[in-house]
Amino acid sequence: MRTLMVATVVCVASLYAMAGEVSLDRAFERIRSVADATCKVTDVSLRLKSDPKGKDPLEMWRAEAKEDVAVTGAFVRVDFTLAPEKGSDIKCRAVLTMPERWDGRLWGQGNSGRAGSLPDLDAYVAMDTAAVTTDLGTRAAGPKFLDKSVPWPAGVLRDFHWRATHLMTVYGKRIAKAFYGRPCEHAYFNGGSTGGRQGMSEVLRFPEDYDGVISVLPDNNAAVSDIALWHLWRQTHGPDGKALFTKEELKSVSDAAIEFMANTDPKPYAGHIIADGRFSESEIDGFLAFAAKKIPSIAEADKVARLKAVYMPLVHDGKCYFTGFAPGTNSGVNFHWGSLLSLPHFLAGKGFPQSRWNEVGFDQIDMYLRELSPEFNACSPDISAFTKRGGKIIMTAGWEDQTIPPGPIVDYYERVCEANGGIGEVSKSMRLFCIPGCAHGGGRGRVMTGSPSGMQMKKLLVDWCENGRAPAQIHVKWRDGSVDMPVAPYPGLYRQDADGAWRIEKRPRGVARIDAKCLETKVVLPGNFR
C-alpha cells in the first residue's frame, strides 16, 4: 500500500506538472502555511480510499439519513487543531477532492449531540467537492466530558456553542484556497440536531460564512430543548428519581394517539402515523381518555394528569417555557439522559447533580436561561443579514421527534415570519418542512428510520442558491416501501385522494408562543473569540 500511495502521489504530481500547475508537494506546503497562532495543521495526506468504518458513537443523534457512498478517486485529507484560547482543543478535518474534479464548493458538516468525534465526510468526496467538519472541542473538558455530573469550562462551552464552527469555516476556506489556488465559489452548511444549531448559529452570528444552510431537526432553540427534557423527567419520574411509567405503557399511549386520530387524519397517515402533531387541548383530553380505557394502569393515581402535562405547553407564572411534546412517537415519550446537552453540566456546576434533579425548579431553570442560554441558543428571528446576501435555509422538523421536539421549531419559524415580512416573503429565502413519521437521527419512527438529508437536501439547496429554484417539496420513503411520501413546505400537508393522487391541504399555522426569555440569543461579532 505504501508503494502504491507513493506511486499515486508521483503520478498525480506529474499530471499537474504537465498541465502547468504547481506540484502536489507545493500545494501541501501552501496548506501547512495556513497554520498560525490559532491553527495547527497536524496532517496533510493523499488518500486513496476511506478509513474502515467503525461504530459511530453518535449515530442515534445524527439527524440525517445514512448514505452508502463509494470513494473511487484520490483525495487530500487535512487534519488541523484550533486553540483560540488556553484550554481550547478543537479537532477539525477537511477533505479536498483533486483539483481537476472540484466543483468549486466547500461544505461545512455539522456534528451531533455533545460531539467529541469527527463526522464522516465520504459523501462529500464522492460528490467531487470539498468539506470541513469539527468535533466542537468538547473533549477538552476532560476524559469524562460525557459525564453529566462534570461541569464544562467556559472556554469549552464557547467552542461548543458557536466558536468552533465559525473558526472551522474560516480555516477550512483558507485550506481550500491554499490547495486549489483560488477561493471557493460557494459555501454551504449541512447539519442536523446539534449540527442544525451550528448552521443557524452561523446564519445569525457569522452571516458571511455560508451561502446556504441545511438545518435538519435543529437544536437551535437549545435551551428550550433541554428544558423540555427536564420537564419530561419531572412528569415521568417520582421524587425518588424512579420511573412512574413503564416503556410499554408509554408506547401504548402513543399507539392510542394514532388510533384516536385514525378517523380524522387523511390518507395515507390515518391508522399509521400522526399527520400533524399539534393537538388542541380537547384532542389531548380525548386521546388520553381513550388511552386510559385501553390501558387501565395509566388511570391510576395522577398518571393521566402527568401525561397531559407532557403534551400541553409548559407554563409557569404566565410564561411559556415549552410548547409540549407531540403525541404519537414510535417509542412513546421515554426520557433519555443522553439527549440532554448543556443543562445537566450547568446544574452540576450549581450543586445539582443527577441525584438531586428532584430538587430542581424554575429558579434553577431561570438561572440557566440567564447565565448560559444566550450563547447556546441560535434562535433570533432576525435572519436579515444572511438573507440580504442571498442566503437560503432549508429547515425540517419531525412530528415524531422527542429529542428535538417539533413545536419549538415551528414557533421559531413563525417568529422569523413575523420579523421578516410574513411567510410569503420569508419563503423566498427560508422554508420549513414538517415531516410525519420522522423521529430523531438514527431513531426509528413508525414508518421511517432517520430523516431526509443526504444528497436530496444538498441538491435542493444548491439548486435554490445557484439557480433560484426554491424547493417545492421533499420526498421520504416509508421503511416498508409502501409509500413514497412528498412533504410540503409548512403549513402545507400532502394528502392522498381516493385515486392515489397527492394534493396539498393548507393547515392552520402556529403553536404555543414560547416566552422571549427562553429564546435570548447573543449575536457575537466576527473576530470576538473570547
Where are these regions (language model features)?
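Conserved alpha/beta-hydrolase "acid-adjacent" motif
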Residues: 403-407
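Cap/lid segment of the alpha/beta-hydrolase catalytic domain
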Residues: 103, 112-181, 227, 356-365, ...
